[in-house]
């Protein structure tokens, strides 16, 4: 009898073991789900606190789904099984206030636009000074380098040209400087085709002094070139000036101006005196600002005269703790030229100068 009781009690033992194993497995699963849920909530709380979407990197798929429902996830890249989606628009950020310098402000602030104003000439006339001075104005954004679009790079197209420009706000003017435009035959037509409303700035200087400065710059790069006198004349005894030499031809301003007046009225061309830019920079820049239709922000308080260089420099500003002068090449000592050569060139330029004065309605007093 005892044998039977013991024999019947034996079979239920495997069922108890299975029940215990099932209960243990269920307990582990519940623990794992609770752990995953707590991790998800912790990451979600941090994401909300930091104000940016977070992606759960753990193994819990449930946690990932909960995060995706709560906030958009922005991982570094889509997984192979997911198509890429357009990113959500960023929250609006208050625009920082632009200071007077063109070098300040967010690089992505504003829009890249084609220039509304160009400094088109002339070489060695003072164009770099005008560019650096006008860049102080908060309503002007200028390209620092010379793009040479309308003379050398026109084939690249206007989209390429626009891509070079600094970003500007609606209230700002985009400007660039390339002095060789003034003597480029195709430049007026090309600029007109871009915009017939483009404002043009031409910095002019005594053509004899300009030619000597041009030669001095070339000599510093090519010390083996002929003398200034040798390049200026075909026959000095007869006084035959070589107008094929670029340094001489650039100074025949009225001839180049005729090409521009075929496309632009004189009211759209402003002439800056290179001489007055040295003696009265605030006055000349005041007229430039009037021409561009912006307030007179640049005044006497922005300049001081550098006796070593012999021309005005910018005082320190809010964006620059140090005064700004033009580069070392500016203000270099000119080569000594025979006074008789200078007199001959003055006589050569005289009729061109007079015609230029009459055309633009200004007497630059170069005689």
UniProtKB/Swiss-Prot annotation:
<keyword id="KW-0333">Golgi apparatus</keyword>
<feature type="region of interest" description="Disordered">
    <location>
        <begin position="61"/>
        <end position="110"/>
    </location>
</feature>
<feature type="topological domain" description="Cytoplasmic">
    <location>
        <begin position="1"/>
        <end position="19"/>
    </location>
</feature>
<feature type="binding site">
    <location>
        <position position="213"/>
    </location>
    <ligand>
        <name>3'-phosphoadenylyl sulfate</name>
    </ligand>
</feature>
<feature type="topological domain" description="Lumenal">
    <location>
        <begin position="40"/>
        <end position="367"/>
    </location>
</feature>
<feature type="compositionally biased region" description="Low complexity">
    <location>
        <begin position="84"/>
        <end position="96"/>
    </location>
</feature>
<keyword id="KW-1133">Transmembrane helix</keyword>
<dbReference type="GO" id="GO:0008146">
    <property type="term" value="F:sulfotransferase activity"/>
</dbReference>
<keyword id="KW-0472">Membrane</keyword>
<feature type="glycosylation site" description="N-linked (GlcNAc...) asparagine">
    <location>
        <position position="102"/>
    </location>
</feature>
<keyword id="KW-0735">Signal-anchor</keyword>
<feature type="binding site">
    <location>
        <position position="205"/>
    </location>
    <ligand>
        <name>3'-phosphoadenylyl sulfate</name>
    </ligand>
</feature>
<keyword id="KW-1015">Disulfide bond</keyword>
<keyword id="KW-0808">Transferase</keyword>
<keyword id="KW-0325">Glycoprotein</keyword>
<comment type="function">
    <text>Sulfotransferase that utilizes 3'-phospho-5'-adenylyl sulfate (PAPS) to catalyze the transfer of a sulfo group to an N-unsubstituted glucosamine linked to a 2-O-sulfo iduronic acid unit on heparan sulfate. Catalyzes the O-sulfation of glucosamine in GlcA2S-GlcNS. Unlike HS3ST1/3-OST-1, does not convert non-anticoagulant heparan sulfate to anticoagulant heparan sulfate.</text>
</comment>
<feature type="binding site">
    <location>
        <begin position="245"/>
        <end position="246"/>
    </location>
    <ligand>
        <name>substrate</name>
    </ligand>
</feature>
<protein>
    <recommendedName>
        <fullName>Heparan sulfate glucosamine 3-O-sulfotransferase 2</fullName>
        <ecNumber>2.8.2.29</ecNumber>
    </recommendedName>
</protein>
<feature type="glycosylation site" description="N-linked (GlcNAc...) asparagine">
    <location>
        <position position="306"/>
    </location>
</feature>
<feature type="binding site">
    <location>
        <begin position="146"/>
        <end position="152"/>
    </location>
    <ligand>
        <name>substrate</name>
    </ligand>
</feature>
<feature type="binding site">
    <location>
        <begin position="177"/>
        <end position="180"/>
    </location>
    <ligand>
        <name>substrate</name>
    </ligand>
</feature>
<keyword id="KW-0812">Transmembrane</keyword>
<dbReference type="InterPro" id="IPR037359">
    <property type="entry name" value="NST/OST"/>
</dbReference>
<feature type="transmembrane region" description="Helical; Signal-anchor for type II membrane protein">
    <location>
        <begin position="20"/>
        <end position="39"/>
    </location>
</feature>
<feature type="binding site">
    <location>
        <begin position="330"/>
        <end position="334"/>
    </location>
    <ligand>
        <name>3'-phosphoadenylyl sulfate</name>
    </ligand>
</feature>
<dbReference type="InterPro" id="IPR000863">
    <property type="entry name" value="Sulfotransferase_dom"/>
</dbReference>
<feature type="glycosylation site" description="N-linked (GlcNAc...) asparagine">
    <location>
        <position position="193"/>
    </location>
</feature>
<dbReference type="GO" id="GO:0016020">
    <property type="term" value="C:membrane"/>
</dbReference>
<dbReference type="Pfam" id="PF00685">
    <property type="entry name" value="Sulfotransfer_1"/>
</dbReference>
<dbReference type="GO" id="GO:0008467">
    <property type="term" value="F:[heparan sulfate]-glucosamine 3-sulfotransferase activity"/>
</dbReference>
<dbReference type="InterPro" id="IPR027417">
    <property type="entry name" value="P-loop_NTPase"/>
</dbReference>
<feature type="disulfide bond">
    <location>
        <begin position="313"/>
        <end position="325"/>
    </location>
</feature>
<dbReference type="GO" id="GO:0006024">
    <property type="term" value="P:glycosaminoglycan biosynthetic process"/>
</dbReference>
<feature type="binding site">
    <location>
        <begin position="124"/>
        <end position="128"/>
    </location>
    <ligand>
        <name>3'-phosphoadenylyl sulfate</name>
    </ligand>
</feature>
<feature type="glycosylation site" description="N-linked (GlcNAc...) asparagine">
    <location>
        <position position="235"/>
    </location>
</feature>
<dbReference type="GO" id="GO:0015012">
    <property type="term" value="P:heparan sulfate proteoglycan biosynthetic process"/>
</dbReference>
<comment type="similarity">
    <text>Belongs to the sulfotransferase 1 family.</text>
</comment>
<dbReference type="GO" id="GO:0000139">
    <property type="term" value="C:Golgi membrane"/>
</dbReference>
